[in-house]
UniProtKB/Swiss-Prot annotation:
Record key words, sorted: Ribonucleoprotein, Ribosomal protein, RNA-binding, rRNA-binding
Matching InterPro entries: Ribosomal_bL28/bL31-like_sf, Ribosomal_bL31, Ribosomal_bL31_A, Ribosomal_bL31_sf
One protein family per Pfam: Ribosomal_L31
Protein name: Large ribosomal subunit protein bL31
Job description of the protein: Binds the 23S rRNA.
GO cellular component, one term: ribosome
Recorded family membership: Belongs to the bacterial ribosomal protein bL31 family. Type A subfamily.
Keyword ATP-binding: no
Subunit structure: Part of the 50S ribosomal subunit.
Organism of origin: Deinococcus deserti (strain DSM 17065 / CIP 109153 / LMG 22923 / VCD115)
GO terms for biological process, alphabetical: translation
Secretion signal span: none
């Protein structure tokens, strides 16, 4: 077996809205998340509207009609 081929695992802080919500091991020292199980509606049982743009909406907002006109 080869030695030293695996990445080094370090203590990692999972950060949600500027607060540390969990600590684990990973190859990164910090991971910033938008949603985690402590606030996700599926796990909390509350119903709420998550206001996020989809990939297509972000693309259209960024490039708009200019991309569609170039394809034709």
């Amino acid at each position: 077996m080869k030695k030293d081929i695996h990445p080094k695992a370090v203590p990692t802080k999972i950060i949600y809205q500027g607060k540390v919500v969990m600590e684990t091991l990973s190859t990164r020292p910090e991971i910033h998340v938008d949603v985690w199980s402590g606030v996700h509606p599926f796990w909390t049982g509350e119903e709420r509207f998550v206001d996020t743009e989809g990939r297509v909406d972000k693309f259209n907002k960024r490039f708009g009609d200019s991309y569609r006109n170039k394809k034709k």
